[in-house]
Design a protein with these regions (language model features):
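Phosphate-group recognition and catalysis centered on beta-loop-alpha active-site segments
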Residues: 1-247
Length: 247
């Protein structure tokens, strides 16, 4: 069965990466929840997608330029006054559930990795005793490798941008993943075909999809039987999977 990951806690249903979205996700029949982790200036780990505060909070400027004391006073838009969450707080929301936490290790502007950030995230999961409940993902292959080196065993996925897939070709993507001992690729849903799924699996790698946010994309990835996909509409994905599953 293809697993469903509630992307940013269901970003088209509730305010993304918020307590509201995560608590609602715990009530859904999903296997995974996806969220994003940035560092603060004082090395706290906060759950927010963008590297700046402007889009999703009432603050402005880079996330990593402020201490947690300042960030904790900001309000997430659409939440009725809730603040952003620390990684440890999100872990505690999902700890009592069977849902796997899928963390994307974010970068600074221009996709420049934060020094030591991936390793800090991995060690935080290890200290919280949830390594076996987590999957680390990144669009930067080196970032994935840094996290895995810091905490083993660690499930991990390389998210491949369409431009990377086009520029270097699928064979080189697979070779790079194999060379880095990365067991799974995540490709954008519009870059996936039955042939590509077969080639990736024949190479001994798992295959997932992302940006599956409408009925057509969800149906496509369910038909391709990928291992997992992320979606901003987990409710829709759950319903479609149930309808397509033989009884």
């Amino acid at each position: 069965m293809t697993d469903i990951a509630s992307h940013r806690g269901g970003a088209l249903l509730w305010p993304e990466n918020s307590r509201i979205s995560f608590e609602n996700t715990t009530k859904l029949a999903v296997e995974q929840v996806e969220f994003d982790v940035h560092p603060t200036r004082d090395s706290k780990l906060v759950v927010i997608h963008d590297d700046t505060l402007d889009r999703t909070t009432d603050g402005k400027g880079p996330v990593a330029a402020q201490d947690w004391a300042a960030l904790s006073k900001l309000v997430l838009k659409g939440t009725g006054g809730q603040r952003m969450l620390l990684l440890d707080e999100v872990i505690e929301i999902f700890r009592p559930t069977p849902i796997v936490m899928r963390l994307e290790i974010k970068c600074a502007p221009d996709r420049v990795p934060y020094p030591g950030h991936a390793a800090r995230v991995a060690r935080a999961l290890e200290q919280a005793r949830v390594l076996d409940r987590c999957v680390l993902t990144s669009f930067q292959l080196g970032t994935v490798c840094e996290a895995v080196a810091a905490a083993r065993p660690m499930k991990h996925v390389w998210l491949v941008l369409p431009q990377v897939q086009t520029d270097i070709g699928l064979a080189n993507v697979i070779a790079s993943a194999q060379g880095a001992d990365v067991p799974m690729l995540g490709l954008r849903q519009n870059m996936l075909t039955a042939e590509i799924v077969a080639i990736v699996r024949a190479a001994g790698l798992g295959i997932g999809g992302w940006a599956c946010n409408d009925a057509e994309a969800i149906a496509k990835l369910l038909a391709l039987q990928v291992d997992v996909f992320t979606t901003d509409r987990p409710d829709l994905a759950i319903a479609q999977r149930a309808a397509q599953t033989p009884h």
